[in-house]
Amino acid sequence: MVTTNEPNIYETGVLDSNAEGNFVYTTLDAAINWIRKNSLWPMPMGLSCCAIEFMAVACSRYDLSRFGSEVTRFSPRQADVMIVAGTVTYKMALAVRRIWDQMPEPKWCIAMGACASTGGMFRSYSVLQGVDKILPVDVYISGCPPRPEAILEALLTLRKKLDTQQPARTFFKKEEPREANAPVPVNTEMPLE
């Protein structure tokens, strides 16, 4: 039998019968999802007039920091939510995709406004008809430009979506990457319509 000079925690009274209620039990997935949804760091990709509405959301009247998104980053390496706000042209599409590729995993995308979602009123040869042609979009915000309340609703929708993910199980299973995260080629040539 091995003896040590260390006291037994049960004999010293450090852990008693009342200690059971003082612990929080959770799964690893729930803990990771809670951390992710309460610390979303957006990166606004302001391409036109919708970017002004995003500035209004960050002000004190709407208080984006209530949702853990007060740290607006303009560096893709420090952000995990890209908010594409405005018209995406074919020339700008390659730059948007490069910035998306520089963001670390996990990352999410919000298409803000009618122009980012569907091309909006600009149905022409030079405008990409929806940013979902080059990026996997998680949440769409309608409107031209959308109201600040709609942007807050999109963040809440993204937070609900994060509750359903299983990051620890995906990590330990070593699954293949999802099709939505696969690289999407960008056609930089003008369409022949």
UniProtKB/Swiss-Prot annotation:
Binding of [4Fe-4S] cluster, residues: 49-50, 115, 144
One term under GO cellular component: respiratory chain complex I
Matching PANTHER family: NADH DEHYDROGENASE, NADH DEHYDROGENASE [UBIQUINONE] IRON-SULFUR PROTEIN 7, MITOCHONDRIAL
Membrane topology: Peripheral membrane protein
The record's free-text note on cofactor binding: Binds 1 [4Fe-4S] cluster.
Ranges where the record places region Disordered: 172-193
Name of the protein in question: NADH-quinone oxidoreductase subunit B
Cofactor requirements of the protein: [4Fe-4S] cluster
Reactions catalysed according to its record: a quinone + NADH + 5 H(+)(in) = a quinol + NAD(+) + 4 H(+)(out)
Pfam families named in the record: Oxidored_q6
NCBIfam families in the record: nuoB_fam (TIGR01957), PRK06411.1 (NF005012), PRK14815.1 (NF011390)
Gene Ontology MF, one: NADH:ubiquinone reductase (non-electrogenic) activity
Gene designation per UniProt: nuoB
Role noted for this protein: NDH-1 shuttles electrons from NADH, via FMN and iron-sulfur (Fe-S) centers, to quinones in the respiratory chain. The immediate electron acceptor for the enzyme in this species is believed to be ubiquinone. Couples the redox reaction to proton translocation (for every two electrons transferred, four hydrogen ions are translocated across the cytoplasmic membrane), and thus conserves the redox energy in a proton gradient.
UniProt xrefs under Gene3D superfamilies: 3.40.50.12280
UniProt xrefs under InterPro entries: NADH_UbQ_OxRdtase-like_20kDa, NADH_UQ_OxRdtase_20Kd_su
